[in-house]
Amino acid sequence: FPEMNIGAGTVINGAQCLDALNAGAKFIVSPGLSTEVAEICKANGVPYYPGCVTPTEIMQALDLGITTVKFFPANVYGGLKALKALSAPFPQVKFIPTGGVNRDNLEEFLAFDKVAAVGGSFFVEEALNK
């Protein structure tokens, strides 16, 4: 699938980010926000989706020019209710919830206009069980 857009996840430092980019990653995802990773991604023109769950983390992401963030773990930090609350002061931010997203709540998350995408291990688990 040459047209597939493949990235790297759970990237937590600059060295891992550079390794992922050298391996061909087209985007980077982190469980938290790393200024070092953000700067490397910006310099290489690669999207970076850091984990942000508090207003402070979201403001730090915005200061770095990042407007789409990973919301992880979504189930621990309040799920869709929290996303809706955070969207009030940050209407320009889109979220990618992961952690606790499953077939039972997938449509509810995707129906919210501030959700850019979702992630979850259930995609892989279901494919492996076939």
Q: Where on the chain are the PLM-derived regions?
A:
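Glycine-enriched alpha-helix->loop->beta-strand junction motifs that scaffold or abut catalytic
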Residues: 1-3, 22-28, 43-49, 63-68, ...
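Catalytic beta/alpha-barrel core
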Residues: 4-12, 17, 24-33, 47-58, ...
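Glycine-rich beta-strand-to-loop/alpha-helix junction loops that act as flexible
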Residues: 8-9, 97-100, 118-121
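Catalytic cores of alpha/beta
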Residues: 13-23, 56-64, 81, 87-88, ...
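Glycine-rich phosphate-binding active-site loops on the catalytic face of alpha/beta enzymes
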Residues: 31-37, 70-80, 114-130
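Aromatic/hydrophobic pocket-lining residues that form π-stacking "cages" and hydrophobic walls in ligand
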Residues: 37-41, 57, 83
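N-proximal accessory regions
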Residues: 73-87, 91-99
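Short capping/connector residues at structural and topological boundaries
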Residues: 98, 106, 128-129
